[in-house]
């Protein structure tokens, strides 16, 4: 029992010292299980209160934003959000996840094509924002592509 509490304290310490500085803002009462398996890349990534992330060495979690031309990707995560192992969120435009959402294992959210369909050397391609309204649950291994809005309580 004491060993489990010690491990949880270490997870909190690791998150506060190594992951928090990578977020533009990170709300209170967050918890990341195995935080060394969460990859935060890019600017303009923020999360609200009570974010819970479950990461694993075999199913890492990735939050990535990309800049191109004069644009910057953005990920905004609301309060009370659960992100499960293997989730990837990539943004070249904007991904908005509102309060009380759950992302099951292996989900992928992307707001860009990541290349043009005619000229594959053209970076990023077409982008359109993604919005998950409040109380949305994205099921196991789901893919949410550019321009999608999922309504409240879905």
Predicted regions and their residues:
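Domain-scale signature associated with acetyltransferase and cell-envelope carbohydrate enzymes
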Residues: 1-110, 133-134, 142-144, 152
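Conserved binding-pocket/active-site segment within a compact domain
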Residues: 110-113, 117, 126, 138
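A short, acidic/glycine-rich surface segment
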Residues: 61-63, 116-121
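Conserved catalytic-core motifs of eukaryotic protein kinase domains, centered on the activation segment
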Residues: 113, 120-122, 148
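Glycine-rich NAD(P)-binding loop of Rossmann-like domains
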Residues: 70, 121-135
